[in-house]
Amino acid sequence: MSPRRLAWLAAFALIAASCGGGSSSPSSPSTPTTPTTPTTPTPPATSACSAIGGVAGTIQGITNGTSCSLATSAVVKLNMKDSGGQTVGGCSGTVIDRRAVLTAAHCLVGEVSSVQVFQGTGATIASASFSAHPSYSHTSSGSSGLDIGVVITATDLDRTPVPLLFSRDARVGEQAVVAGWGQDENGSSSGLLKAGTTSISNVASTWLEAAASMTSVNVCSGDSGGPLLLSEGGAWALGGVTSATSGGAYCNSGTSYFANLRHPDAQSFISRLVPGLTSK
């Protein structure tokens, strides 16, 4: 089954061994890097919320996925509007500066004329501008290029920005935290922010991959643009952006794909648009 893009259905939920959504496939990754023994211990599912700046809440029918407090997390929900003000899609994103959100390129192309940022509480914040990486291209047969984009907001975001991991490659076998607002394994969009853990199964120049298992989470419709976090120097940093999955209708199998922020073209694109970002 071809990997599917994860935009639409309003948000990014991170799910446990069961969610995968979207449409079309990323281009074939380049040769994987040599596996390296990971040094980061597996964070328990209940600690995943703290990795994204939230507080763990009740598990809402998601295997290994924990619902998180909305009041403090840097993982936000994006609603895309067309020129007539109609909603044309929904994604997740991560606050990386006081007025900047990192998300997926495929969330920002097509009919999108404006973006509304919802922090989980309070009013939405309008975009001042948004940009998809210029290398990104999508056709009926698949997509290519770096699936990353940046939303610049009109006013400050009330969240602590997440640093980006620019200094090293992800490692095969390394544990990671993913989070978002999308569908769960029952095909339900609960409107909850969720987080959980997974493991890196492949590393390529433009893509990171994580295979679904009974002990890991998987991503689903609405999860596009959300973070893949890696531990560095005792803190969590943004190493990838959720892009696509090869999972089935209930997001319970296959491989999830994340744009690799280690790629120099990704780093130069983000740094140009967000000169004040913090990296590790």
Predicted regions mapped to residue ranges:
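N-terminal activation segment of mature serine protease catalytic domains
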Residues: 44-86
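Conserved catalytic-core segment of clan PA serine endopeptidases
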Residues: 56-70, 109, 113-159, 165-168, ...
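C-terminal subregion of chymotrypsin/trypsin-like serine protease catalytic domains
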Residues: 19-35, 43, 48-51, 56, ...
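A conserved glycine-rich beta-strand in the N-terminal activation segment of trypsin-fold
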Residues: 75-98, 143
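Acidic glycine-/aspartate-rich tracts in secreted/extracellular proteins
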Residues: 82-84, 106-110, 121-123, 154-159, ...
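Chymotrypsin/trypsin-fold serine protease catalytic domain
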Residues: 144-218, 222, 232, 253-257, ...
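Sec-dependent bacterial lipoprotein signal peptides
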Residues: 1-17
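Short conserved beta-strand and strand-loop elements enriched in small hydrophobics
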Residues: 76-79, 113-123, 174-180, 230
